[in-house]
Each structure stands twice: as C-alpha cells, then as structure tokens.
Regions:
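Short, non-helical or kinked segments that cap or interrupt transmembrane helices
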Residues: 21-31, 75-84
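Interfacial segments of multi-pass membrane proteins
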Residues: 30-46, 88-96, 108-117
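Helix-adjacent hinge/juxtasegments
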Residues: 49, 53-93
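Amphipathic, cytosolic membrane-interfacial segments at TM-TM junctions
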Residues: 70, 74-79, 115-131
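Juxtamembrane boundary at the C-terminal end of a transmembrane helix
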Residues: 151-167
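Alpha-helical transmembrane segments of multi-pass membrane proteins
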Residues: 16, 38, 57-66, 93-94, ...
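Transmembrane alpha-helix interface/packing and boundary motifs in multi-pass membrane proteins
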Residues: 12-30, 89-99
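Final/C-terminal transmembrane alpha-helix of multipass membrane proteins
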Residues: 135-156
Length: 167
C-alpha cells in the first residue's frame, strides 16, 4: 500500500505542475494532495506542520489565482467581458492545434471580449494586455509553487531513501 501511496503522490505532484497551466486543474492544490498521500505512507515520515503550511500556501494561491487576472485587467482598464474572454481564450488555446495557443488564446480572448463590450480598439488592446499579463503572473506563481512542492517531495523521498528502497 505504501508503494501505491508514493507512486500516486508523485503522479499528483506532476499533475499539479501541469495544472499550473490548465484552468480546470488547480496546480498547487493538486500537488498538495500528493503531500497528503505521502503523509499517509508508513514508510515516509514528515511533519504534520509541513503538511499544514503547504495546505495554507496552496489555498492562498488558489484564492489569489482568481484575483490576479482581474487586477491586471482592471489596472489596464478592462471589463468583466475581457476577463471572461481571457478564460475562454485560454480554453480554446489549449484545444487549438497551434503552437503557443496557451499564450495566444488568453490575449485574443480578452481582446475579443473587450471589443464585444464596445470598447474602442485602443482601450480593448490595452485591457487585453492587462488580462494577459495577469494570467501570466498567476500562471507563473502557480508554477513556482508547484515546482517548490515537487522539490520538497523529492527532498523528502531522498532523505528517506533507505526506507523507500528497502521495499
């Protein structure tokens, strides 16, 4: 059972890193569930304090993820249409078979959303840039946290490799 927990924990850690880029999967929280599974393993020991701290960070980043793109859009004069367009553009960008669709999609989505909001093209372009910048900032933060979690996970396994490799 311990091997199952450890393998599933690694899977969740890697899925969390991937989830940093996907809007439907909360990256740091998914990675945190990897810590939770590792915590339940009898072979690998680490403190409950680390588990609680990483949970608090993951929840904080998850909440922040909803505000950063909106703040970017607002700072550059964007509307709710631009923010919705960013999300729709991200989903389309993920599905579209074009290189860099994950980056082009949110920008185009925000631009189209602002144009639908009857903004002039200069305002729409500025707001689209703000939404896109907010999206990139949020994605970068989630990616960094998920990578730190993966690094901690590897460090915990490495420090207790004797127990893990004795299987």
């Amino acid at each position: 059972m311990d091997v199952f927990f450890i393998v599933m924990a690694l899977f969740l850690m890697l899925l969390g890193v991937l989830g940093s880029f996907l809007p439907v999967l909360p990256g740091p929280i998914t990675s945190w569930f990897g810590f939770l599974l590792l915590y339940f393993s009898d072979l690998i020991q680490f403190s409950k304090k680390l588990l609680i701290i990483t949970l608090c960070v993951a929840v904080f980043i998850w909440i922040l993820d909803y505000f950063i793109p909106a703040l970017g859009a607002k700072k550059f004069g964007g509307s709710k249409y631009g923010m919705i367009g960013t999300t729709v553009g991200l989903i389309v960008g993920l599905i579209a078979p074009i290189p860099a669709g994950i980056f082009i999609g949110p920008f185009l989505g925000a631009l189209i959303g602002e144009l639908l909001n009857k903004s002039d093209s200069k305002t729409a372009l500025k707001a689209a840039f703000g939404s896109f910048l907010g999206f990139l900032t949020s994605t970068f933060i989630k990616f960094i946290v998920s990578m730190v979690y993966l690094g901690l996970f590897i460090s915990i396994l490495w420090n207790q490799k004797a127990a893990f490799l004795s299987l």
